[in-house]
Regions:
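S-adenosyl-L-methionine
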Residues: 2-66
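Conserved class I S-adenosyl-L-methionine
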Residues: 71-80
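Conserved SAM/SAH-binding beta-strand->alpha-helix loop
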Residues: 101
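Conserved SAM-binding strand-loop segment of SAM-dependent methyltransferases
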Residues: 112-122
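A short SAM/SAH-binding and catalytic strip from SAM-dependent methyltransferases
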Residues: 130-146
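A short glycine-rich, Lys/Arg-flanked "PGG" loop and its adjoining helix->strand segment in the class I
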Residues: 147-159
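Conserved beta-strand signature within the Rossmann-like core of class I S-adenosyl-L-methionine
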Residues: 160-168
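Short alpha-helix
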Residues: 190-208
Length: 228
């Protein structure tokens, strides 16, 4: 198995794929939850579907602000329903989303944006030439290996580009097998990670990324990283 295949955000059960053939796509189409990530131990983490499907607000504006004036377009990895892509375009910043969920890609298009239905580990346009790359809304967890994901995201950046990462607000460092769960059932299991600011920065430095900025806004925590 190649590293790329191993890091896909899926442990397949039958033909179902997480974020694709599970309650997430149905929630995006409905524009609302409730929706959770259910851990194997029974605990669960709420997913903010309503916020993701609404226009950019609150801490989102800090991400958009930091993309103004970048020398090249912005790539939103795991763009979900596309609110950040739409907000960037409205601010005059060229942007493209990437997501494995067809409902997310369709929702992004309805907002006037463009998204590709691909894994972040698939081949993507303009690799090494993006002015900014976003990992927001918990997407640092994709694949269950934050170090590998940060290395992948950093490799997409142009020289001088900026990687904007939303971390967990608290200092946590965990990897767990989870399922997306809604009122009508749960999807297949897959590996997911959560890292707070310190754990994220340790992994970033290990793959050649350096901290440019750290900030908190509206209860959310962020890092801006550059290639060293």
């Amino acid at each position: 198995m190649s590293p790329r295949t191993a890091l896909r955000p899926a442990l397949r059960t039958g033909t179902a794929e997480p974020w694709v053939d599970d309650p997430f796509g149905r929630a995006v189409r409905a524009g609302r939850g409730p929706l959770w990530l259910r851990r194997a131990d029974g605990s669960r983490l709420a997913l903010e579907v309503e916020r993701w499907c609404a226009p950019a607000a609150g801490a989102d504006h800090g991400l958009v602000l930091r993309c103004l004036g970048l020398s090249a377009p912005v790539l939103d990895l795991g763009c979900g329903p596309g609110r950040l892509v739409a907000a960037l375009l409205a601010a005059g910043v060229p942007a493209l989303g990437v997501d494995v969920c067809a409902a997310s890609v369709e929702h992004t298009a309805r907002l006037g944006g463009l998204a590709l239905r691909r894994s972040v580990f698939d081949r993507l346009p303009a690799e090494g030439r993006w002015g900014g790359v976003l990992l927001a809304d918990g997407n640092l967890g994709i694949g269950g290996d934050p170090g590998a994901l940060l290395a992948r995201a950093g490799a997409l950046l142009a020289p001088g580009g900026l990687l904007l990462v939303e971390t967990a607000a608290q200092e946590v460092d965990e990897v767990a097998d989870v399922r997306v769960e809604g009122p009508d059932g749960a999807g297949p299991p897959f590996r997911w990670a959560r890292c707070g600011p310190a754990a994220t920065l340790r992994r970033a430095r290990a793959v050649g990324l350096e901290r440019a900025e750290r900030w908190d806004s509206h209860g959310r925590s962020f890092l801006a990283l550059t290639r060293s």
